[in-house]
Each structure stands twice: as structure tokens, then as C-alpha cells.
Amino acid sequence: MGEKQQPSMNDQLRVRREKMQELRDKGIDPFGHRFERTHLAAQLHEKYSDMTKEELDEQGVVATIAGRMISKRGKGKVGFADLKDRSGKMQLYVRKDVLGEDVYKVFKRSDIGDFLGVTGDVMKTDMGELTIKVTGLTFLSKALRPLPDKFHGLQNVEQIYRQRYLDLIANDDSMDRFRKRTKIVSAVRRYLDGNDFAEVETPVLHTQAGGASARPFITHHNALDINLYLRIALELHLKRLIVGGMERVYEIGRVFRNEGIDTRHNPEFTMLETYAAYFDFHDVMDETEGIFKAAVAAVSDDGKITYQGTELDLGQDFERLHMVDAIKKYAGVDFWPKMSVEDAKKLADENGIHYESWWTVGHIINEFFEEKVQDQLKQPVFIYGHPVEISPLAKKNAEDDRFTDRFELYILGNEYGNAFTELNDPIDQRARFEAQVAEREAGNDEAEGIDEDYIEALEYGMPPTGGLGIGIDRLVMLLTDAPSIRDVLLFPTMKPID
């Protein structure tokens, strides 16, 4: 005798539709209505798990729960099942002599994946498992497709991302990660709200792409007959609000960049940007550290986490290091002495650093950092003092105008935050925009254009301001030990199946 052959998918779909019709023939709606429950599974476990079988029998606790049936066993007149709701699962003990033949048959003919509502006595089995002995059963919704195999979960990575709902049903780790994401974002909001920042919403459709160096998505507004850009950053509208006197603002919103997809990039992602009048970049470092400590507290009691095997301590004070000092420390090259582009290119050649023909000294300093230093930064460190050439919206440093009052937060060689003392001089801002236009003409297709409306806003006066950008998805990846950005996006961008 060979193994019992599994029914084909077509057979399973047909049988489930037949069972749906059986319910209708009995006058039961296979896609039911509102159901009032008294408890979630976890509440029952929390309240009654420590009680003995006898204590529970004596108390006579009755509960009503609802959820998806994820397993079922038993023969004849007695059956067991596991019902899963958003909090966890609960075992059901179902007897024909308690429910009556008709209702018991509804249970027996139900499939894994169906939704049931049950009322019954909370008890413990002889094995000590908290269980509901069902006295009433309501059929709530028929699953016309079988769930992924419960023992193997959902293994196909492509299917996990395309059909996240199946992943959430099958993989508790995945559900837990997205719950943590919600807690992390809430913690960030609470921190900012508690520091008197106002949450605002700014336009997603822009007449000009700005605030970052990135390729935008372009769409067309039919009534106005103009092209619009999906925002590549939140920055320029938020700074207009600082001009308007709001003083402390933040936005958590979707941003869109028409670029490649990899483990750290998705075309649409969630950004946090904050702006505070009268802050400089040192104040923003303190703010950033506060945000990260608030976020990690949502998932860790002591500020320690492990990311892909490396233990990180986000509870400690974060190190602060100038980019030039970091290059000196990790690569042994000193960019403090002023030098010509030729001198910088010579240093690049000697150290095997790539450069483009149009680059200036600042671009080469940045490339040294990215190639020689970045990967060595493991524990949290603020790298500040970026060259002016790569920071078109940051204020120049008062002591050395080759550099800006800007920082990035690095953890495990990856950037988790970008901030600066904002450029509030409209004349300098125009010159920076014009330099970007020149770069674009020289071949940099990610350089920004001139935003005249933004310059006009600056001309009305913007107080000294500190600004910050944090990629929420990357923050969640870090705090939930997720190897890919797709693991923290409920519905990542996927190429359609033909």
C-alpha cells in the first residue's frame, strides 16, 4: 500500500464550495455577521492559566471567543480544535452530546481556515491545557481556499511578500514583527509629542521634486494639464512651516524614489522628518538619540538588541566624530589641511578610491568615508561635518566653510539618520541650488533644480533651525532583526506576475 494521496488543489476548492452550499441549505450564512465576544484568547490564558482544574470547575467561568480555526482533531462524537485570534490561540473541546447533532455536524464539516465564534465553559484538560468546552457555536466565515501547510509555514519568500496575509496567518514571527513596528512608530510619536513637536501633513504631489538627491516618479494632473512629482522628501514644505512660525514640526509619511530595489531600498518607504527652530545640529543629535532610545524601549527593556548576530547597545551614549577625524582614525588619511582638487584626486589614486571627472575635494572626502570608514562603524556613532558639496541644504560650519553643520547616525555601517543645522540664508540657498543645476548639466541626474517658491519663503526669514530625517523602515529593521526592508513592509513593491 502506498501513501494516502493528497487531494489536488482543485478537489479541495470544489469540496470547500460544496460545504459552503451545505451551510446555505441548512439556513446558515457561510459569511456571517457581527459577533460579540467577551474575551481574547490571551486574556483567558493570562487570567486562568495558573488555576487548577478543580478551581476552574468551581468558578464556573463562561467565555465567548472568535477566531480562525487553525487545527482540528478527534473522531466520532468528540472533537478538539485550536481557534486563533489576534492575541493568540485557544483550544476548543467539542462534544456532540453537548451541542446537539445539527450544530456538531457544522463543526465536523468545518475546515481549517474557517472562522468560528464559540461560547463555553473555561476548563483544563487532564494534560493541564486551558480549554473552552463549547456549549454554543456560530459559523462566521467560510475559507474557500486551504491555508499553507501548518508544519512548514509559508516558506516561499516570493509568496510571503506577495501574499502577506498568508504570511501573517502562518508565521507568528512575522505578525510579531509588524506589531513591534506599530509600537516603535507610536513610541517615536510619543517622544516628539512630549517634546512639543506638532505632527503635520504636507503634500505628496509636488510641482517640483526637491529636498533630496533622488529620481522622482512623475505623474500627470489632467485637469491642470501639468506634470507632478511624487515627493522624494518631506523637507521643503516642513521648513516653510518653520518660516510660518510653527517652530517645532514633524511628519511621518510615505516618500517615493524611482530607483532600484534591494534589501535596504523600496521605491516607497516611510520617512520621519523633524524641524525645530533655534536648534543647531548638536541639539538635533540629542533629539535623535532620544528618538532612538524611545524606539528601542518599545522592544527591549535594557536598550540592548541583536541585529543579525551582532549585539548593539542603544542604551549607551552615542559616540560623536567629525567625518575628517573618522577618515584619519580608520583610513590614516588626513583631509584637514586645505588642498586642491588635484591633491585630493592624487590621494584618491594612492588609496584606490573611485572618483568622477566633475568631483571636487568634498566629493572625494565623502567617497573616502563611504569606501574606507563606513563599514567599520558598528556601535551607534554620529558622523558630522559633511563637505558642503554633498549637503546643498545644510548650513556651512562657522569655523571651516568647507564643511557643514550636518551629521549622519551610523550603526553597523548603515546610515539611520541624517540631520543638519538648516541653511536659512536665501542667497546662499540660491547659490547651492545653482550649483546643483550645474551638476545636473555635468551628468548628475539626481541633482536638484531651483525651487523659487522655497527661496521666496526663506526671504521672509527663517529662524536658525535644526532638521532631521530618519528612515522608519530601516529603524524597524534594526529593532526587529529583519534582514530585508521587505520584511518590515506589509506590502513591498513587487513586479507583477505575468
UniProtKB/Swiss-Prot annotation:
<comment type="similarity">
    <text>Belongs to the class-II aminoacyl-tRNA synthetase family.</text>
</comment>
<keyword id="KW-0648">Protein biosynthesis</keyword>
<dbReference type="GO" id="GO:0000287">
    <property type="term" value="F:magnesium ion binding"/>
</dbReference>
<dbReference type="InterPro" id="IPR045864">
    <property type="entry name" value="aa-tRNA-synth_II/BPL/LPL"/>
</dbReference>
<dbReference type="InterPro" id="IPR006195">
    <property type="entry name" value="aa-tRNA-synth_II"/>
</dbReference>
<dbReference type="GO" id="GO:0004824">
    <property type="term" value="F:lysine-tRNA ligase activity"/>
</dbReference>
<dbReference type="InterPro" id="IPR044136">
    <property type="entry name" value="Lys-tRNA-ligase_II_N"/>
</dbReference>
<keyword id="KW-0030">Aminoacyl-tRNA synthetase</keyword>
<keyword id="KW-0460">Magnesium</keyword>
<protein>
    <recommendedName>
        <fullName>Lysine--tRNA ligase</fullName>
        <ecNumber>6.1.1.6</ecNumber>
    </recommendedName>
</protein>
<feature type="binding site">
    <location>
        <position position="415"/>
    </location>
    <ligand>
        <name>Mg(2+) 2</name>
    </ligand>
</feature>
<dbReference type="GO" id="GO:0140096">
    <property type="term" value="F:catalytic activity, acting on a protein"/>
</dbReference>
<comment type="subunit">
    <text>Homodimer.</text>
</comment>
<keyword id="KW-0436">Ligase</keyword>
<dbReference type="InterPro" id="IPR002313">
    <property type="entry name" value="Lys-tRNA-ligase_II"/>
</dbReference>
<dbReference type="Pfam" id="PF00152">
    <property type="entry name" value="tRNA-synt_2"/>
</dbReference>
<dbReference type="GO" id="GO:0005829">
    <property type="term" value="C:cytosol"/>
</dbReference>
<feature type="binding site">
    <location>
        <position position="415"/>
    </location>
    <ligand>
        <name>Mg(2+) 1</name>
    </ligand>
</feature>
<keyword id="KW-0479">Metal-binding</keyword>
<keyword id="KW-0963">Cytoplasm</keyword>
<dbReference type="GO" id="GO:0016740">
    <property type="term" value="F:transferase activity"/>
</dbReference>
<dbReference type="InterPro" id="IPR004364">
    <property type="entry name" value="Aa-tRNA-synt_II"/>
</dbReference>
<feature type="binding site">
    <location>
        <position position="408"/>
    </location>
    <ligand>
        <name>Mg(2+) 1</name>
    </ligand>
</feature>
<keyword id="KW-0547">Nucleotide-binding</keyword>
<dbReference type="InterPro" id="IPR004365">
    <property type="entry name" value="NA-bd_OB_tRNA"/>
</dbReference>
<dbReference type="GO" id="GO:0006430">
    <property type="term" value="P:lysyl-tRNA aminoacylation"/>
</dbReference>
<dbReference type="Pfam" id="PF01336">
    <property type="entry name" value="tRNA_anti-codon"/>
</dbReference>
<dbReference type="InterPro" id="IPR018149">
    <property type="entry name" value="Lys-tRNA-synth_II_C"/>
</dbReference>
<dbReference type="InterPro" id="IPR012340">
    <property type="entry name" value="NA-bd_OB-fold"/>
</dbReference>
<dbReference type="GO" id="GO:0000049">
    <property type="term" value="F:tRNA binding"/>
</dbReference>
<keyword id="KW-0067">ATP-binding</keyword>
<dbReference type="GO" id="GO:0005524">
    <property type="term" value="F:ATP binding"/>
</dbReference>
